[in-house]
Amino acid sequence: MCYTSYILNCHLAILYLTGLRHFSRLLQFNLFNSTGKPGKPAVQQKLGNELDGPVIVNTDLITLTVTVTDTYGRYVSGLAQKAFTILEDKQPQEITYFSDDDSPVSVGVLFDVSGSMSGDKIKQAREALSKFIQTSHNSDEYFLIAFNARAQLLLDRTRDGNAVLDKLTFVQTRNNTALYDACYLGVEKVQRGLHPKRALLLISDGQDNNSRYSFNELRRLLKESDVVLYGVGILGGGDAGSSLGMEGQGIMDELANVSGGKAFFPRSPVEMDDIFEQIALELRHQYSIGYKPTNFANDGKWHKIKVKVTPPRGLPRLFVRSKEGYYAIPGAR
């Protein structure tokens, strides 16, 4: 080998080794966080950096999911836009978007697999969930989060409802309950869904004892988002009358109410089946209404919304359920 070739080969070897060391440093940076310690999966930290801080939405157009029922709790569809009145901070608003179509929904299923859901609770909940899926729109999009001591994404964005049920077939109940963390992750995930209409279905006994996020943080997030939460409280035996059972019911009620949804507490497997079917029907018999506030300002304040509906002549009073307001977050536009 000539001297020139020898020098060239040495240079190439040095460059190769330097590249390996550089790649090694890059790999180490990806595997370890800034403190030099092994990084945790996103859902094991405070549900990942992408969840820190509020969810910011474009508040130029305020969109509402509105449920209308009669005195017997039956869903009322087919109302015209002129039947609705929107008030923001007591001021009438002009409706710029209106639809009562049976449109598909992005649905996040949040399923409690903690120790308190053991025995018949989880079995009955799995069976009742199949009623929800059978009654839902064929184009609905699902994802599944199971939670005990931490929240874990088991299934990400599928139109196959049976895949959701299959994932739950062999799940075992154990450990504590990170309910707030699961809901927080659920809001973040469902807001990236394919469909403009978004909902969470929370299936739990409502008892949180292991979350990093607090109840107030989750409540604020739900008020900021356009996600409707439905809760099904799985209370067995003497749970309903116990202090923990009462606390769980109060938590689910409040989380559902601030989002414009509703919480249910079935007393039997038959009633549970009916409730899951009822939630699916509600999602298919809602109105989507949008408006641009007449005096919109990114002031970060809470703006109260009231939706009124005037029944057609000769019909009795109708009842409306929707979000009660929004935060106009600076920088949202």
Regions found by a protein language model. Name each.
Residues 29-333:
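Scaffold/interface architecture of coatomer-like assemblies
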